[in-house]
Amino acid sequence: MSATKEKTYLKWYQKLAYGAGDLASNCSYGLVASFVLLYLTGTMGLDSAIIGSLMLASKVLDGISDVIFGTLIDRTHSKLGKARPWMLYGQVGVSLCLFLLFAIPAGSTTMQYIYFFVVYTALNAVFYTANNIAYSALTALITKNNNERVQLGSFRFMFAVITNIVMGFSVTGLVEKFGGGTAGWRTTALIFAIIGLVVNLSLIHISEPTRRVVIS
């Protein structure tokens, strides 16, 4: 007696598009995690200890927002489904804040610290959190096939690794190519912000199955 074949829900290109979502995420996460301190201390001349304290305070807010957005996504019912609206809105905010984070205006040092904290918190605790929680939830929403879920995770990991490697080798070179200093960082951040937004839009075409509501 042969085993029953598990139903499949996704085409190969949908799996690829889903995995590419981690490329979009790492365009922002990778740039901030690996290079924002270099920009803030090396180019802007800000104090690393103060920056570290501001980041720590922001992480507290980030932990709170995880719960909030998880609840909001679960309660969302729209034409795009539960997850995709938050992924779209979140990525727009991520891309905007990523550019602004590497475009700190000239002025008093105090105002620069305030500017950094506000933009950094908006990026991480609001928009990135909304996008990433929705992105993770999308796996369970688009397929019930366990093998496909594993494949989605593999595609996601592959794109994350590739993106981090490429960024590790290219970011400082791009900064220098575009003039170095504040202008170089600003242009480089803009490039990755646009890439992240464009790639994230590919996920909008992955449909969440319509769920029937049974009235007893």
What residue spans do the PLM features occupy?
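Membrane-embedded alpha-helical bundles of multi-pass transporters/translocases
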Residues: 2-207, 211-212
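Hydrophobic alpha-helical segments, chiefly the membrane-spanning helices
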Residues: 215-216
